[in-house]
Regions:
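N-terminal transmembrane alpha-helices
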Residues: 33-65, 69-70, 86-98, 127-134, ...
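Transmembrane helical elements of multi-pass membrane transporters/channels
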Residues: 44-63, 166, 233-237, 241, ...
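Short alpha-helical transmembrane segments in multi-pass integral membrane proteins
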Residues: 2-49, 103-170, 218-277, 333-398, ...
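Small-residue-rich hydrophobic transmembrane alpha-helices
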Residues: 75-135, 174-193, 307-371, 402-425
Length: 485
């Protein structure tokens, strides 16, 4: 009895101490304002973005699942081609970010004309660029796959080339969908991009299923149907984006078709590119480094390529809430600074950062015990599943530093602080991930686990530097210094 009372007293003392510690934090005094921020600003932005990203990734997982029935060589081919496609999509997404920030900032200042001009001209410039890029990549497709695939088997290289040549045709449509969705998000409308991108990805699954496996008496196209289905669905999504902008679902961004023929305003283009170009350099160099580490993995055999691809697919699902909160922080920061609310922008970014850290860590630690189950959706090969489990447990162990590495720079970009992120990204990727990944994975023979440890070192360096940038306040260098409220 005495022991039970003593234990109860100890528990109460710990509980009281924890409560007092929470009460003394700056967060507690402002908890009501943070509650308003969460429900009125973060939730309306982040939840549709989260659902949109979830839909995109789940459709990607289902697409991979469809291809996986054709064999691990087909899955490896898609993984290799997509590792290059992701570099291009990252470039488009960086310009999309520039459009989002300029639109959000312009509407914060109630300048609708400038917001529409930024969206329209970004669409024109990036569509033309995507057409040229698609032609060049299609012409040099074999050389690109030979570089990316490294020592992969000829069969895997052939499948990767087929997939690349089909998906490269979708680049103009992907540019339109990304830029248009970014402009709508900058205007605070996240539901329409959710509906369009969600519908586009559902169509991708339906069309790809029919094209791969056939319907009724038609036998289908086999592996080629996967790339063709993706391309067709992206063009449907691009048409939907143009239509939404044309009829003015969001009055602030009504862009008639004939307005695309107007002369370009290079002042606005440079404003968008001033954010988009450093962000695109960051994305291309970062994803180029990822591509190089993919080449390390490609030389380890088909099974290891599948291990890496499956683990990345599952990890991407775990990171979805953080990506959504990062996108929301870009929009919130841009709008706050557009109205001159510098102190609010700083407080709200800190709140989003800590929220992301807690949520992602809880999800990663909660899902790690089920890593083998997730791997079973992709493959039944036991050796592949064992490696995937190791990678996902490592991912969970390092998840507490993920938000500092990825959510904070998203908020900084809303303040147009893009060059610092570019340099940090280059340092983290090329100074840590590539060097450490090669040393651990290839030189020391740790395989794909060593490559992933190099990635976690990149997270740590990025997180430390971005957190220092937040605490120092230097990310607000474009705005007058104010006394913190």
């Amino acid at each position: 009895m005495w022991f039970q009372l003593s234990s109860l007293r100890s528990i109460l003392n710990v509980s009281t101490a924890l409560r007092q510690a929470v009460v003394r934090t700056p967060w507690y005094a402002k908890r009501k304002s943070y509650k308003v921020l969460f429900w009125r600003e973060i939730t309306p932005l982040a939840i549709p973005i989260f659902l949109e990203n979830t839909c995109v990734l789940l459709m990607g997982v289902l697409s991979t699942f469809l291809v996986s029935w054709l064999g691990k060589e087909a899955m490896a081919g898609v993984g290799l081609a997509d590792s290059f496609n992701m570099v291009i999509m990252a470039f488009f997404a960086a310009i999309d970010l520039g459009t989002t920030v300029v639109v959000a900032f312009s509407l914060g200042k109630r300048d609708r004309r400038r917001a529409r001009a930024a969206a329209r001209q970004s669409l024109v410039i990036m569509t033309l660029f995507a057409v040229v890029l698609a032609v060049v990549i299609h012409y040099f497709g074999s050389e690109i796959i030979n570089i990316v695939a490294g020592e992969a088997t000829p069969e895997v290289k052939g499948l990767a080339l087929t997939y690349l040549e089909l998906t490269v045709l979708s680049y103009p449509a992907a540019a339109i969908a990304l830029i248009g969705s970014g402009a709508l998000r900058g205007a605070g409308n996240t539901k329409i991009p959710l509906m369009i991108n969600g519908g586009m990805n559902i169509l991708n699954i339906i069309i790809s299923s029919i094209l791969i496996y056939g319907a009724f008496s038609w036998q289908g196209l086999g592996f080629a149907g996967a790339g063709l289905g993706l391309t067709i669905s992206r063009y449907i999504g691009a048409v939907a984006i143009i239509w939404v902008l044309m009829i003015g679902f969001n009055p602030a961004l009504r862009i008639p078709l004939k307005s695309y023929l107007k002369p370009l305003n290079f002042g606005i283009i440079w404003e968008v590119m001033g954010i988009g170009i450093p962000a695109s350099i960051e994305s291309v160099l970062f994803n180029g480094g990822k591509l190089l580490t993919q080449m390390f993995v490609a030389g380890m055999g088909t099974n290891v390529i599948a291990d890496n691809f499956i683990a990345f697919s599952v990890a991407a699902l775990i990171n979805l809430p953080g990506n959504a909160l990062g996108s929301a922080s870009t929009i919130i920061t841009g709008k706050r600074l557009g109205t001159g609310q510098i102190g609010q922008a700083e407080r709200q970014l800190r709140h989003v950062f800590w929220m992301s850290t807690i949520v992602l860590t809880a999800i990663a630690w909660g899902t790690a015990p089920f890593a083998g189950l997730f791997a079973s959706f992709y493959t039944q090969e036991q050796d592949v599943k064992e490696v995937v489990k190791v990678l996902l447990w490592l991912n969970a162990a390092f998840m507490p530093i993920w938000a500092a590495a990825w959510v904070l720079p998203s908020g900084f970009k809303g303040a147009r602080d893009v060059r610092f992120a570019m340099w940090v990204s280059m340092l983290g990727m090329w100074g840590c991930r590539v060097v450490a990944g090669y040393t651990l994975g290839i030189v020391l023979g740790m395989g794909v686990v060593g490559v992933w440890l190099g990635m976690f070192l990149d997270w740590a360096v990025r997180g430390a530097l971005f957190y220092w940038r937040l605490v120092s306040g230097r990310w607000l260098w474009r705005y007058p210094r104010v006394k913190r409220e």
